[in-house]
Structures are given as C-alpha cells and as structure tokens.
Amino acid sequence: MRQYKEINPDIRIVGFSNSYSEELIKLGGEAVEGVAFPVIFFSKSDDPKVQEFVKNFKTKFGSEPSALTAQAYDSAGIYFTAVEKLGSDQDSAAVRDAIAEMSYEGVTGTTKFDANGDVEKSFTKVTIKDGEFVLLESGSNE
C-alpha cells in the first residue's frame, strides 16, 4: 500500500470487511491511514449492547471480539430467541419460520431476512485515523 499511496496519493482506498483488524494497523502503519472499510461490527460503537459485549468479552478472553465472533454471538441470539418464542413447539420448520419472521437487535445491528431467506443487514463504514479505527458513517447495505 505504501507504493500505491506514493503513486496515487489522492485516490481513496477501500478495503473489504475481513481486513478490519488491529493487525492491519500494526503491519501497515502510516500506509493504511485513511483506508475505509464497510464492517458489520464496530467494537468502538457507542451502542450500549456493543459496549457491554466488548467489555464482557475482554474480561473473559483478554482481547476485543472480532466481527466473526460478534456474528456468531448474534446468530446464537437469533436461534435462542426463536426457540424461546416457540416454547415446546421446536421442530426445525417452526424454528426456521420463527427466524424468518424475526427482526433481531444484536451487537451487529438489526438482522432480518427477506422472502428468500437472505439476510438484510446494514454496514457501518470505518476508516483508519491516527492509527485507530474510527466511525466514518453508518448506513444500509444498499
């Protein structure tokens, strides 16, 4: 990236969500300043659910949760919410239907599903500024 920024200093670089990691900042240094990312989970969000999740995760594991960890956490939350709603009627079709009708508010934001079962999710846009990930903007996946 250093060479790219030397050749094209005015072009904004947009990374993909899996690039969102503290390791990128450590390895990239100044070369990654200003790079933007769409992310499904932003650990520095001011959302109280996110703050509590990050605090509890750090206490237990000694580091911040990754986006994949947050997605797994919300996936479990979606499943358990559906099962709790159904009570004793917990066959797989009933669970699937309960999940399909749900709008779940989790640490990765709102999760819901369209008629095809595809997830509808908003992304948060972040950038690297002074060696830290900071919020650029929040928005939809459109």
Predicted regions and their residues:
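Extracytosolic ligand-binding ectodomains
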Residues: 1-142
